[in-house]
Amino acid sequence: MYKEPFQPTYEYALECDKHDELKDFQTEFYKKEGTIYLDGNSLGLLSKRAEKSLFTLLDSWKEYGIDGWTEGEHPWFFLSEKLGELTAPLIGALPEETIVTGSTTTNIHQVIATFYEPKGIRTKILADELTFPSDIYALQSQIRLKGLDPDEHLVRVKSRDGRTLSEDDIIHAMTDDVALILLPSVLYRSGQILDMKRLTAEAHKRGIHIGFDLCHSIGSIPHHFKEWDVDFAIWCNYKYLNAGPGGVAGLYVNKKHFNRLPGLSGWFSSRKDKQFDMEHTLTAADHAGAYQIGTPHVLSTAPLIGSLEIFKEAGIERLREKSLHITRFMLNLIAHELSDFGFTIGNPLEDEKRGGHIYLEHAEAARICKALKANGVIPDFRAPNGVRLAPVALYNTYEEVWHSVQILKKIMKDEEYKQFENKREVVA
C-alpha cells in the first residue's frame, strides 16, 4: 500500500500520497486553504457527511416537531442505540454493549458508580499518574461519595520516565486491596498504547474489574473487547471520530454485567417499551442503553451519524495501517531535519506501542506552537513542554507532513518562536 523504504524527501511524500488507498476521503472534510491541520487528536475536522446529518436532524425538528422522536430518517428515540451499533465494530464489541451517551466525564461517573463496590479490604481504585486530569477528578469524587478519603483509596501507578507506564508496574499494583481499575488505552501526552489484553487478563486473575478510557485510541487503533473481555470503557467522539466540539460521548459495558443496575439511573435507563408507563420503579434496559441517564442530546449527536458512515467505509484496520506509516514518516523526518534543535521524541518508537499522534518535547514548546500556528500549521501544546502533532489518516497527506516539518525547521533555524511568549493560551 505504501512505498518502502522510508525516504526523507518531498518526492517520497508525493509518491506515498499517490498510492494512498484512503486519499479519496480527504475531499469529505473541510480543510482550510493555506492551513495544515495536525490537531485531530484534540478536535477532528468537520466532514461534509457530518454536516449533512446535522442538517437532516434539524430538518426533522422543523418538519415533525415532537414526532421527531419516532419519525424521520433518524428517529431520536432510538438514535443513541443505533449509533452504539455503528460504533461497536471500532472497539470489537457487540452492538448491544455499546451506547452513545453523555460526556466522557459523566460516563466515568456512571461506570465507577456502577462498578466501584468497596467491601472488606477491597476499597481502592487503581489509576495512574499520567492519565488525563478529568479521570482523576471523577475518581476522587466517587471515592468521596463512598465516605472514603481519595488520598488513601486512590492509587496512582508511577511512571519511570515521566512519559510512559510499565505494564509490569501496573500489574504489581494490582494488590488484594484494589476493588477497581481505570486506565487510559493511549496516554494523551506520549501516545503510548497500553496492552489492554494483558492488563485485563491480569486484573481478572485477581478478581478485579477493569475499564479503559479510549479517548485517544477510538477511531485511531483497532480494539478487540469481545476477545479481551474488558469490563467497561468510556470515550469521547470529537477527536478521531470527528463528531464535533462537545459531541456526545460513548460507553461500553460487557454483556456479562447487564444484570447490574446502573449506579446513576435516569429516565433513559428504562426499557423502551416501559419508559412511557411513567412508573416510579425503574425497569432497566437489558443492554448498554441502561447506562444512559437523561434525554439524549440529539443535535450534539447528529454529526456522528455521518462520521461513522465514513469509518464503516474506510475500515479501522486500513486507517491504522496508514496512521502507523504516516507517523513513522513524520518521526523519520523529525530525526533527519530537527536533530540540531533540542527536540526530544516523547513517543514509544515501536509501532505496536504508538498511537496516532507524535509528541515532541522542548523547553520552548508553548511558543513553538504559537509560531507553528502563525505559519499555518495547527498543533497543540500540552504542559509542561509538549508539542502534539497528529497526522490523521482520513484527511492528512504525506505532503502536509513534509511541509509541516520544513516549517518547523525554519521556525527553529530562524528563531521565529522568540517573537512569542513561552506560556500557553487559555485553551492550549
UniProtKB/Swiss-Prot annotation:
It holds the Pfam family KYNU_C. Keywords: Hydrolase, Pyridine nucleotide biosynthesis, Pyridoxal phosphate. GO terms for cellular component: cytoplasm. InterPro entries: Kynureninase (IPR010111), PyrdxlP-dep_Trfase (IPR015424), PyrdxlP-dep_Trfase_major (IPR015421), PyrdxlP-dep_Trfase_small (IPR015422). Coiled coil: none annotated. GO terms for biological process: anthranilate metabolic process; L-kynurenine catabolic process; L-tryptophan catabolic process to kynurenine; NAD biosynthetic process; quinolinate biosynthetic process. It catalyses: L-kynurenine + H2O = anthranilate + L-alanine + H(+); 3-hydroxy-L-kynurenine + H2O = 3-hydroxyanthranilate + L-alanine + H(+). Pathway: Amino-acid degradation; L-kynurenine degradation; L-alanine and anthranilate from L-kynurenine: step 1/1; Cofactor biosynthesis; NAD(+) biosynthesis; quinolinate from L-kynurenine: step 2/3. Pyridoxal 5'-phosphate binds at T104, T105, F132, P133, S134, D135, D213, H216, Y238, W267, T295. Its cofactor is pyridoxal 5'-phosphate. One of its GO terms (molecular function) is pyridoxal phosphate binding. Its EC number is 3.7.1.3. The modification N6-(pyridoxal phosphate)lysine is found at K239. Homodimer. Catalyzes the cleavage of L-kynurenine (L-Kyn) and L-3-hydroxykynurenine (L-3OHKyn) into anthranilic acid (AA) and 3-hydroxyanthranilic acid (3-OHAA), respectively. Belongs to the kynureninase family. This is Kynureninase. The lineage of its organism: Bacteria, Bacillati, Bacillota, Bacilli, Bacillales.
